[in-house]
């Protein structure tokens, strides 16, 4: 039958190992390499030893004590202390704005009796009577507010450090007065602060006002020792001037150049735009159940201007470390439920892979000194309506996270047409307001970012930032390093699978049921399964190998492998143990179904909780001991074959994912039954179990011990027409014992007859099974 495809995939897994071994031998084959002179001459490989290179830091540090500078005349900036180191008696500095402010400071050495001295101030000779009867120097601050007035002593600083300070700030001129080490500041007002200039006759320093405490310390206690040595030479003030140059956001610097290779350092300002992808899958049936709401990788391409240059960029957004939530509104078919919906929180990461068409990405193969910095962005979730057939719709809304830059590595993006060497920016998460909830349910006030509507109507989220890297590139700019040498951190995320899933699932409405039954009965093999894609035998063999490589890691293949190992262990123990009661006891070891059921014999509720696990194991036994009836895997494989033939997007790259996913996800709601005389025992994956008579369909008590005995030696049958459908059919139309027996055994001829008669109950049941064949 059609399910032969799954059995072939399971039994032919050995060919995959052989294929891998052949590929490995081929890759280890020796090759001749031509070596040219130069430390980087080996054209296929980068240098072995890499230094850390230049470490760039854009932080500008302003010195606390800037100087000393030579005597000069200039207009001092606001908010900076000018600290003057007087080294002789006489005029220390002169300062004026030529309107309402004239001041000069004169220095008087210790032990001076009252005396008249001549000083040249602002180009004029002035006579002041001065005296100093202390052991310290005195600095007289002479001041006038009009050119017609005479200078008078406004403040005096008595100091043993011989330091004088002046500051322009807040519309006032600030100076020190008093006696060290307890000198303090005082100020004079002026209406024209910005135009005040100063002529300094001694060495001086510049200190930012933010470091005023240090300036106060120097005035009262003196300069640091290093400033008082002869090795400190004052510089002209012009040496402090900065040649302002507009920073280049798009800069390429040659770090080194030797032979065939050169090291290029790239700086780039970037704008990252990305969006989240998601997948919402509704379970077939009455329309009240959803199977999953999950995140998917999403590509986004856009253009932006960078330093006048038009840049084309491409991003891929994916998530890691999702949290799985679920909601079950009840056990009835009309109760709303979500089997799994994904939420990202503090333990999650968002990855954004970025590429643009600049030179930095052209040869991004051998890279070092990779650094980056990005802004943060807040993502707020939108609303999603669960459109149930009857009643008020539940609505999932809200949820928010903030994304913060957490690191950068190399990666490779795969688009539909080309693979791109990229930068992967890792973003950590913090949860934010608002919380998310599902209206009309008990799910309220949960924090995180659900996958239901992550973009919230926005075309994209945007982050700006900057990165730099040093790349080893060919000296010849026309040569591009082969991408095959790139070391990537991931492979293709979903490729075209998202679009393919949507197309694949939409084809369910176009499948003719009569042809489906016929197709399910055909012994389809791998080559007939894939013939709709490629006609040549060679390509079909290659695709079959690729499918087996992927299928080998599927849940179904893993379960079969575990079962085989258990069976071997059971057979081995049977051959060694002479007290074995029967072969059935050993055979039962491979499923553990007998033990599972026996262990719960004391509690009927426990039976319900275990039947889901048991039914999955029954699928494996049915596959090994095939009956004449049709199985769920026959329908699953037939639908898969039909959709492969109808699909326009399936190719050899996506086929392995499709076949493997179909084996795991097609028809998740399955029922299996075991017959004994005129009684049927039936369990399903939802935890329901029934026991009933074939003649009347009357339910009888479910005998757990009897089921445990039967499950080891009786054939397992797929309940294509389950108990509820059978009872509905009998109650409304009436069926004979022969028809009932054939439907219970999933006889394909009987099923085809009912479908050809367009019987509504049977037809609806088959339609529901087809709708469950979703990815």
UniProtKB/Swiss-Prot annotation:
Region (Spike foot): 509-775
Location of region: Spike head: 65-223
Motif DGE motif, residue numbers: 307-309
Cysteine disulfide partners in this protein: 317-379
GO biological process, one term: virion attachment to host cell
Annotated spans, Spike body and stalk (antigen domain): 247-478
Residues marked Cleavage (site): 230-231, 240-241, 246-247
Stretches the record annotates as Hydrophobic: 388-408
Keywords: Capsid protein, Coiled coil, Disulfide bond, Hemagglutinin, Host cell membrane, Host cytoplasm, Host cytoskeleton, Host endoplasmic reticulum, Host membrane, Host-virus interaction, Membrane, Outer capsid protein, Viral attachment to host cell, Viral penetration into host cytoplasm, Viral penetration via permeabilization of host membrane, Virion, Virus entry into host cell
GO CC annotation terms, alphabetical: host cell endoplasmic reticulum-Golgi intermediate compartment; host cell plasma membrane; host cell rough endoplasmic reticulum; host cytoskeleton; membrane; viral outer capsid
Coiled coil ranges: 483-517
Motif (KID motif): 643-645
HAMAP family: Rota_A_VP4, Rota_VP4
Misc. comment: This strain probably does not use sialic acid to attach to the host cell. In group A rotaviruses, VP4 defines the P serotype.
Family that this chain belongs to: Belongs to the rotavirus VP4 family.
Protein name (Swiss-Prot/TrEMBL): Outer capsid protein VP4
Source organism phylogeny: Viruses, Riboviria, Orthornavirae, Duplornaviricota, Resentoviricetes
């Amino acid at each position: 039958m059609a399910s032969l495809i799954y059995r072939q995939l399971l039994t032919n897994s050995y060919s995959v190992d052989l294929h891998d071994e052949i590929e490995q031998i081929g890759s280890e084959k020796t090759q001749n390499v031509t070596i040219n002179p130069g430390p980087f001459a080996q054209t296929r490989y980068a240098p072995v030893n890499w230094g850390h290179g230049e470490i760039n830091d854009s932080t500008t540090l302003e010195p606390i004590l800037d100087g000393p500078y030579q005597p000069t005349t200039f207009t001092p900036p606001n908010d900076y202390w000018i600290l003057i180191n007087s080294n002789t008696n006489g005029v220390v500095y002169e300062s004026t704005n030529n309107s309402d402010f004239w001041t000069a400071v004169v220095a008087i050495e210790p032990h001076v009796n009252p005396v008249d001295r001549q000083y040249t101030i602002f180009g004029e000779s002035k006579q002041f009577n001065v005296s100093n009867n202390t052991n310290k120097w005195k600095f007289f601050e002479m001041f006038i507010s009009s050119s017609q007035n005479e200078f008078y002593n406004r403040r005096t600083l008595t100091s043993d450090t011989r330091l004088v300070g002046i500051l322009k700030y807040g519309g006032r001129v600030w100076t020190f007065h008093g006696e060290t080490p307890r000198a303090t500041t005082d100020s004079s007002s002026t209406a024209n602060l910005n135009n005040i200039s100063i002529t300094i006759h001694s060495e001086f320093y510049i200190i930012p006002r933010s470091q005023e405490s240090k300036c106060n310390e120097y005035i009262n206690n003196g300069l640091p020792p290093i400033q008082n040595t002869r090795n400190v030479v004052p510089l002209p003030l012009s040496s402090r001037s900065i040649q302002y140059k507009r920073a280049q956001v798009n800069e390429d610097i040659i770090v080194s150049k030797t032979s065939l290779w050169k090291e290029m350092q790239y700086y780039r300002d970037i704008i990252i735009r990305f969006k989240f992808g998601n997948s919402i899958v509704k379970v077939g049936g009455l329309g009240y159940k959803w199977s999953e709401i999950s995140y998917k990788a999403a590509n986004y391409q856009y253009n932006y201007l960078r330093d006048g240059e038009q840049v084309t960029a491409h991003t891929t957004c994916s998530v890691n470390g999702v949290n799985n939530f679920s909601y079950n509104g009840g056990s009835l078919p009309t109760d709303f439920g979500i089997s799994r919906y994904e939420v990202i929180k503090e333990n999650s990461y968002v990855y954004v892979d970025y590429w643009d068409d600049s030179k930095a990405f052209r040869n991004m193969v051998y890279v070092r000194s990779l650094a980056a910095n990005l802004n943060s962005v807040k993502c707020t979730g939108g609303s999603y309506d669960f459109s149930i057939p009857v009643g008020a719709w539940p609505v999932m809304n809200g949820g928010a996270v903030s994304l913060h830059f957490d690191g950068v590595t190399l990666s490779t993006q795969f688009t539909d047409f080309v693979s791109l060497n990229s930068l992967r920016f890792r973003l950590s998460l913090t949860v934010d307001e608002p919380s998310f909830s599902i209206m009309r349910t008990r799910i309220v006030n949960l924090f995180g970012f659900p996958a239901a509507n992550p973009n919230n109507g926005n075309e994209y989220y945007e982050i700006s930032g900057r990165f730099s890297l040093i790349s080893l590139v060919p000296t010849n700019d026309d040569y591009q390093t082969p991408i095959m040498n790139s070391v990537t951190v991931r492979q293709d995320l979903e490729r075209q699978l998202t679009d393919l899933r949507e197309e694949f699932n939409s084809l369910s409405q176009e499948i003719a049921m009569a042809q489906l039954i016929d197709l399910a009965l055909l012994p389809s093999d791998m080559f007939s399964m894939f013939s709709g894609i490629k006609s040549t035998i060679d390509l079909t063999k290659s695709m079959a190998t690729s499918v087996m490589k992927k299928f080998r890691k599927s849940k179904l293949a893993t379960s079969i492998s575990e079962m085989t190992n258990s069976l071997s262990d059971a057979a081995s123990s049977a051959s060694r143990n002479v007290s074995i009661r029967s072969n059935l006891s050993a055979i039962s070891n491979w499923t553990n179904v007998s033990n599972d059921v026996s262990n719960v014999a004391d509690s009927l509720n426990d039976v319900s909780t275990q039947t889901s696990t048991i039914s999955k194991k029954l699928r494996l036994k049915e596959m090994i001991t095939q009956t004449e009836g049709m199985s769920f895997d026959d329908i699953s494989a037939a639908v898969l074959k039909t959709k492969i033939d109808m699909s326009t997007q399936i190719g050899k790259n996506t086929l392995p994912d499709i076949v493997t996913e179909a084996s795991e996800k097609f028809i998740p709601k399955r029922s299996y039954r075991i017959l004994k005389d005129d009684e049927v025992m039936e369990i399903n994956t939802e935890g329901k179990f029934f026991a009933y008579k074939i003649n009347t369909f009357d339910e009888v008590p479910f005998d757990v011990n009897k089921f445990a005995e039967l499950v080891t030696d009786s054939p397992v049958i797929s309940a294509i027409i389950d108990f509820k459908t059978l009872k509905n059919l009998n109650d409304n139309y009436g069926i004979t014992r022969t028809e009932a027996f054939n439907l219970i055994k999933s006889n394909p001829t009987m099923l085809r007859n009912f479908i050809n008669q367009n019987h509504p109950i049977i037809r609806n049941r088959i339609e529901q099974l087809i709708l469950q064949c979703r990815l």
